[in-house]
Amino acid sequence: MYSLPGATMSAAPASIISSSSFVEPLLLAAASPAAAAAAANSHHQVRQRGHLVRTLAASSSSNTLLRSDFDLQEGLTTDVKRMLRQRQKKSGGGREMLVTIDNLKRLCIDHYFEEEIEGAMATGACTRLLHSDDLFDATLAFRLLREAGHDVSAKDDVLRRFIDGASGDFKLSLSNDVRGLLSLHDMSHLDVGGEAALLHRAKEFSSRHLASAVRYLDDPSLAEYVRQSLDHPYHLSLTQYKARHHLRYLQSLPSRDAAVERLAVAEFQLNKSLHQGEMREIKRWWMDLGLAEEIPVVRDQVMKWYMWSMAALQGSSFSRYRVEITKIISLVYVVDDIFDLVGTLEELSAFTEAVKMWDTVAADSLPSCMRSCYKALHTVTNEIAEIAQKEHGSNHVNRLRKAWAVLFDGFMVEARWLATDQVPTAEDYLRNGVITSGVPLTFMHIFSMLGYDDPSTEEEEEAIIDHMPSIISCPAKILRLWDDMGSAEDEAQEGFDGSYRDFYLMENPSRSPGEAEAHMRGLIAREWEVLNRECFCRRTFPSNLVQVCLNTARMVSVMYSYNKEQRLPVLEDYAAMMLVL
């Protein structure tokens, strides 16, 4: 149990950590693509692409939060701000202040203290710690500075002091510094280019010695924290998921920040209440839509779709957006299943042309299930365009319809490959797979609701989807590659549409499946490097858009990390943590 001094709601987070069994039925066969395919209809042709996890976020909760909840948060925020000012005055932004900032970030409550954090980072104390001979201080300072967009070098500013000149490896004396090794491990995932070899060595060194330390640590809380850090590296993992475990670890320490812990619990309670209300609203919409009854072979995984939105758009201010974007995600899944399981090539071509015309009359000649799907996506997309118009003064309906047209064209490419027994190159498959992942389409809708106008296009008909910046393409490619690794051997089906691994092995017959997977993991690592560079160096997009894209990339492994029983334990744990009563 969580026990926060003076906190009346401290028991809530503990109850969700162990309740994953309750969420299992709600994920609706999310544990295995094979289960979903079998449940659909075994006599239909299923393409090898598998679950195209479509990304992201939106929701408007029907749940009314009591004013007292916000008053409690406001009071706790004031307490923490007072503590930050005192700590800054006392330490001048030294280790104690940086540890506090790190805790605020890990607990997902740093957004309340942006001014205080920026002030502390600007004092120069963080830069001084960067050159410390203490591994923990130097690596923590590096990570916070890089995350804030500062130009720092892993080699020149930090790691060269901790490498043995004779062997070229990290000094063996560091192997017993568990706290420093944890921080080094966190730092090792922040490659932005040109540092891959050094940071890979840092990851190997820290991972090896942390794995060894788990066996002899006397503190069970610290041992569990180390295991969590190795299994779910901070930068690559969902911050909301990590926050619960970080809070539990903080509560095991002899020295604690009660105000910070209480605010973290209050924030969790508020978000959980919102998520539950949003989920109820989405379930009502999906049931009223009736597509699952009209098209029995389509996937019916409302909670799974919502969790993409919940992960990507975090915070109470995005509640309505989470609901709306979940609708988009669900319709991408439906369209995917229609292409996979329902339509003939001729019908799918007519479906695509109707979407391009963006006229409900154009859909009149389509089969009933396609008409219903078209009407739903037309309605939801126009509603999102109206939201953007009302809140930001820009109506992006033409860009959104263009995004749908691009997605349908991508599905048609795959349908023709299958119909003509054409075998694409791995590169061509992956390029088209970025589109059919659904990520670019979903991001277009999110960007519109967040009020983003692409400065690189002058005409409304032009869209960011035409020139696909890395902030969009990287999460999409990460998703496609993870999806293909997870589903290539899982999906029971007739027909063959292939995965990246299949096409790579065809082009490289001397390679084994294990080597193909290693190659794919290397591609994923390179996409993370490019995404990191966009997030931490270039800063060409607003921070809220960057965070959406980063959160999406982090969610991918949660959706596709199957265990030996073909279950998704992290997804189940995360759903229980954030949604179960």
UniProtKB/Swiss-Prot annotation:
EC number(s) on file: 4.2.3.48, 4.2.3.144, 4.2.3.25
Catalytic activity line of the entry: (2E,6E)-farnesyl diphosphate + H2O = (3S,6E)-nerolidol + diphosphate; (2E,6E,10E)-geranylgeranyl diphosphate + H2O = (6E,10E)-geranyllinalool + diphosphate; (2E)-geranyl diphosphate + H2O = (S)-linalool + diphosphate
Binding site for Mg(2+) 3: D483, S487, E491
Organism for this UniProt entry: Zea mays (Maize)
CC cofactor: Mg(2+)
Triggers of expression: By a musk indanone elicitor that mimics herbivory. By caterpillar S.littoralis oral secretions, in combination with wounding. By corn leaf aphid feeding.
Comment field on protein domains: The Asp-Asp-Xaa-Xaa-Asp/Glu (DDXXD/E) motif is important for the catalytic activity, presumably through binding to Mg(2+).
Pathway involvement of the protein, from the record: Secondary metabolite biosynthesis; terpenoid biosynthesis
Annotated InterPro entries: Isoprenoid_synthase_dom_sf, Terpene_cyclase-like_1_C, Terpene_synth_N, Terpene_synth_N_sf, Terpene_synthase-like, Terpene_synthase_metal-bd, Terpenoid_cyclase/PrenylTrfase
Binding site for Mg(2+) 2: D336, D340
Subunit annotation: Monomer.
Protein name as annotated: Terpene synthase 2, chloroplastic
Motif DDXXD motif: chain residues: 336-340
Chain positions recorded as substrate binding sites: R299, D336, D340, R480
GO biological-process terms attached to the record: defense response; diterpenoid biosynthetic process; monoterpene biosynthetic process; regulation of defense response; response to wounding; sesquiterpene biosynthetic process
Binding-site list for Mg(2+) 1: D336, D340
Domain of life assignment: Eukaryota
